[in-house]
Amino acid sequence: MAAPPAKGNTEQSEEGDLPQLPVSPKPDDEQSRSQSPTQLQDSPEAGGEQEEEQAFLVSLYKFMKERHTPIERVPHLGFKQINLWKIYKAVEKLGAYELVTGRRLWKNVYDELGGSPGSTSAATCTRRHYERLVLPYVRHLKGEDDKPLPPTKPRKQYKMAKELRGDDGTTEKLKKAKDSEERRVEQTTPGKTKSDATGQTQLPCQGSSRDSTEQLGPVSGPSPPLTGASSCPEAYKRLLSSFYCKGAHGIMSPLAKKKLLAQVSKAEALQCQEEGCRHGARSPNKDIQDSPQNLRGPAENSEHQLTPREGLQAPGGSTRMEAQVGPCPTAPMFSGCFHAYPTEVLKPVSQHPRDFFSGLKDRVLLGPPGKEEGPTTKESHLVWGGDANHPSAFHKGSTRKRSFYPKPKACWVSPMAKVPTERPGAPSPHPSSPGLGSKRGLEEEGFAHGGKKLRAVSPFLKEVDSKETGGKPAAPGLAVSCLLGPTPGPTPPEAYRGTMLRCPLNFTGSADPLKGQASLPFSPLVIPAFPAHLLATTGSSPMAASLMHFPPTPYDAVLRNRLGPASSAWHMPPVTTYAAPHFFHLNTKL
């Protein structure tokens, strides 16, 4: 290795036979003092001390080299290079290393070396240099084992040792605490989502709502027909679970709840469009029992399940209609999602207001006859959001067979309360007859821009005259749905032929915005109608007896009672025969 940087001076003449040994360098003033005449007079004592110092340094360098920790350079302390012989003698004079360390005498050692008195770290630096350069050799001389160097500060020694002893235990405790916390969060989150989704299987929480809606498609695609009804609740549940997994821990403010419901409604509608087309192409031609489940959000308290069995067309050409209607719930919530099946039956995914009228049957929405060819061959675009390029969820099925009732026109109920209304001057995307089309435009314009306080118009079933339908014969088997709420666009006039259920189409046209769009957070109500041949043939049957005349009710009362039982808003007098009252126009004052 490298030689010692500083060589000792040559011994005096009387010790000339000793070899030249490396000694710790001395400053010039010390060397001049050592060479002073007074020290030259005491040359025998000075020579013996220098000889001892030189022997010590030779053996020290040799030992440190054999120990593989050679002393390549001697550090400076207090603006002076350390004299290893002096520091060794000072520590031995004060009682060896252990006693100096125990009594905190390293500052005295520093003073013996003649360092600058203003140094703040003098004691610590002196001790470290001694431990690194001299202490191993001193222990070797005393026959002690070469122990590892003790910690720097003895008072903090106890705390550090205590922390080191408990290090493994504390880390294990921290890991166990983290694991238990993660398990507890994982247990609470599935419980929350299960209570929201009413017993459905828990799906993994996704990072964003877009990923969850994209991954839902291939999962629920090849499922049995029941997944067609549960795909929208699963989309709602996955979005809700992803919201809770982002750190909300089950606590939602009202504003966050409204935002979440809006996001869920958008994603739900898009998902239902994809799933409706997918299930519409794969459903078998047999009775399909649908179990729509009422979506219960964080703020809902009641849960009611409805199991409508919608019969398909019998061989004789008649339609079998059966429904099992449960008791009227107190606070229903609506999702407004539908699926289209190849048998032209419109399946509701969740509970709708038509289920709360015990006399009304859960029915199909049928369209005009003989419109499969000609200018209406193209699909009537049920636009939601104003984008007509996206495929609708209500494409016709793959079956082309002719049935007693022709191809129906699906009725889309928007899950959003705020739907952009079309301009009154915009051309209608649906083919319309001249007479009825102009009347429909005037009616919608009057309701949308009238600015008057609207009153609920009593819905009645009435045959449309052939004059209003453009001189064409009315088909007896057609019925339409009445939308109590904002409509995405003008309804095709062909859907109003035959038996009709007349209801105001724009309840949100009120001048008071708080009573209009803001007060309808969920889907507008849907009141189904019936084919005319059933009304004509059932005379005093229970369904005919259950037809009700709804008295004119203020719009405020309708809003107050829209979440309550139907009997509180409209009374149902027993009717034995069907009376055809006069025709009401939408812009007629009551």
Swiss-Prot record:
Keywords (A to Z) from UniProt: Activator, DNA-binding, Immunity, Innate immunity, Isopeptide bond, Nucleus, Phosphoprotein, Repressor, RNA-binding, Transcription, Transcription regulation, Ubl conjugation
Extract the ranges annotated as region (Interaction with SOX9).
1-294
Tell me where the cross-link Glycyl lysine isopeptide (Lys-Gly) (interchain with G-Cter in ubiquitin) is found: K80, K89
Gene inactivation phenotype reads: Mice are resistant to experimental autoimmune encephalomyelitis (EAE), a T-cell-mediated autoimmune model. The expression of pro-inflammatory mediators is severely reduced in EAE.
Specify residue ranges for compositional bias: Basic and acidic residues. 160-186, 367-381
Q: Which GO terms describe its biological process?
A: cellular response to estrogen stimulus; cellular response to lipopolysaccharide; chondrocyte differentiation; innate immune response; negative regulation of transcription by RNA polymerase II; positive regulation of 3'-UTR-mediated mRNA stabilization; positive regulation of interleukin-17 production; positive regulation of interleukin-6 production
What PROSITE patterns does this protein map onto? ARID
Q: Where in the cell is it found?
A: Nucleus
The UniProt function text for this chain reads: DNA-binding protein that may regulate transcription and act as a repressor by binding to AT-rich stretches in the promoter region of target genes. May positively regulate chondrocyte-specific transcription such as of COL2A1 in collaboration with SOX9 and positively regulate histone H3 acetylation at chondrocyte-specific genes. May stimulate early-stage chondrocyte differentiation and inhibit later stage differention. Can repress ESR1-mediated transcriptional activation; proposed to act as corepressor for selective nuclear hormone receptors.
This protein's assembly is summarised as: Interacts with SOX9. Interacts with ESR1. Interacts with RORC.
Name this protein carries in UniProt: AT-rich interactive domain-containing protein 5A
Q: Which organism is it from?
A: Mus musculus (Mouse)
What high-level taxonomic lineage is stated for the organism? Answer: Eukaryota, Metazoa, Chordata, Craniata, Vertebrata
